[in-house]
UniProtKB/Swiss-Prot annotation:
Pathway stated in the Swiss-Prot or TrEMBL entry: Cofactor biosynthesis; coenzyme A biosynthesis; CoA from (R)-pantothenate: step 1/5
GO BP of this protein: coenzyme A biosynthetic process
Coiled coil: none
Active site: E70
Domain of life assignment: Bacteria
Record text on subunit structure and interactions: Homodimer.
Family according to the record: Belongs to the type II pantothenate kinase family.
Protein name: Type II pantothenate kinase
PANTHER family registered for this protein in UniProt: 4'-PHOSPHOPANTETHEINE PHOSPHATASE (PTHR12280:SF20), PANTOTHENATE KINASE (PTHR12280)
Localisation: Cytoplasm
Record organism: Staphylococcus aureus (strain MRSA252)
Binding annotation for ATP: 6-13, 99, 121-125, 137, 225
Annotated GO CC locations: cytosol
EC number(s) on file: 2.7.1.33
Length: 267
């Protein structure tokens, strides 16, 4: 069995490959000792690691491991997944939305990191907790899926009520900017959490589009663990990308790009 692991700040993504078949699983980074214990009990012919906590795993296992830079691993793994899923892109920006968000440009040959922001899954969990007292990510994202942002976010169309706006009316003018106009509204946890996911998706998308225009590509690929159990985030990102004139791509198992890439970079 061959194993690739991306040990991130919040989640550890694990890919096992045997007989040309892959299996995927995740574990919370706070349970890294359990991952180490599991690895020490397996018969592994190749182990490849990436991510900020790769060194912690390597220091505590009884088998040799190779460690790779997470940006290179993510790019390698993403390229494999894009090809397997039928996406033939000459170049693209990819946004890796994990705890935070890292932005990269792939020119057809290699990747380069072109930016990063602190907005991502960490903000969804942290700000989401402050607004709802929910700590479980699945419960939080489940609750957000049917939330209504209309009384919370101020849209361009809310400002240009009786005239044609100079930009699309569905663009957000101010996240959370509609709240003071609806003080008698029922701001349910579901609505508040939907607004949090909205601001994360729109900020990530805006940054991705900005660098896409800088590098003259219309293709933006979104990956990362923040999309897990979060159809709303995916919809916000895809809709906003199209609204701003670019082409969004979502890759199945994209959160495991780093783990897959590390495995294929390994000798």
């Amino acid at each position: 069995m061959k194993v690739g692991i991306d040990a991130g700040g919040t989640l550890i993504k694990i890919v096992q490959e045997q007989d040309n078949q892959r299996t995927f699983k995740t574990e919370l980074t706070k349970n890294i000792d359990q991952v180490v214990e599991w690895l020490n009990q397996q018969q592994i012919e190749k182990l490849c690691l990436t991510g900020g906590n790769a060194g912690v795993i390597a220091e505590n296992i009884n088998i040799p491991a190779q460690i790779f830079v997470e940006f290179d691993a993510a790019s390698q793994g993403l390229g494999i997944l894009l090809k397997e899923q039928g996406h033939d892109l000459a170049d693209y920006i990819f946004a890796n939305v994990g705890t935070g968000t890292s932005l990269h440009y792939f020119d057809g040959q290699s990747q380069r990191r072109v930016g990063g922001i602190g907005t991502g899954g960490g903000m969804i969990q942290g700000l989401g907790y402050l607004l709802s007292q929910i700590t479980d990510y699945k419960q939080l994202t489940d609750m957000a899926q049917h939330g209504d942002r209309n009384t919370i976010d101020l849209k361009v169309r809310h400002i240009y009520k009786d005239t044609e706006p100079p930009i699309p009316g569905d663009l957000t003018a101010a996240n959370f900017g509609h709240v003071l106009h609806h003080l008698d509204a029922d701001f349910t946890p579901s609505n508040k959490l939907a607004a949090v996911i909205g601001v994360v998706g729109e900020v990530v998308t805006t940054m991705a589009i900005t660098v896409a225009r800088e590098f003259k590509t219309e293709n933006i690929v979104y990956i990362g663990s923040s999309f897990h159990n979060n159809a709303l985030l995916r919809k916000v990102v895809e809709d906003y990308t199209v609204l701003r004139g670019c082409k969004p791509y979502y890759v199945e198992n994209g959160a495991f790009s780093g783990a897959i890439g590390a495995l294929y970079l390994g000798k």
